[in-house]
Amino acid sequence: VVQREQGERGRFPWLRTPHMDRLAAEGVRFRNAYVTLPLCAPSRAVFLTGRYNHLNGVANNRTPFPADSVTHSTLLRAAGYTTAYIGKWHMGNQSGKRPGCDYSASFIGQGRYVDCPIEVNGVPTPSKGWVDDVTTDYAIRFMREHRDRPFAVMLGYKATHGPFDPPERARE
């Protein structure tokens, strides 16, 4: 779980995140992580590959992710994990299944907040509703289907990217 916007305990004292706090307490936390390029796609490419941008080839939001890249999903897959990439990809306008993953459900480019077309394993699939709810549902389904064996899911949310358009339930 990469959860950078809310912070855990204390960054925004009024924001209660008990589940994130529990994950942080029971998992691994990187409290001082830095990026070499402060854009979402280059940062995502570094996270996926563990390589600086001048080595992984993604230097801006328009550059497609090199399909032959070795990702953490590639390595986990080789170790027997079933892997998935779900949600915001946005490295160029790249279509198709995500490199190193057994399963992908993501959208092209910035996508849309509502009724965003999702590509499931490269197949365009209409969706209904707020995009982060839709991608969360894909992630939950994947985890339920694979709960009896090792799996790894990377889920990228759109909501942290402008222009901001929260779901109806959060507008009041």
Language model features by range: what are they?
Residues 1-172:
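Formylglycine-dependent sulfatase
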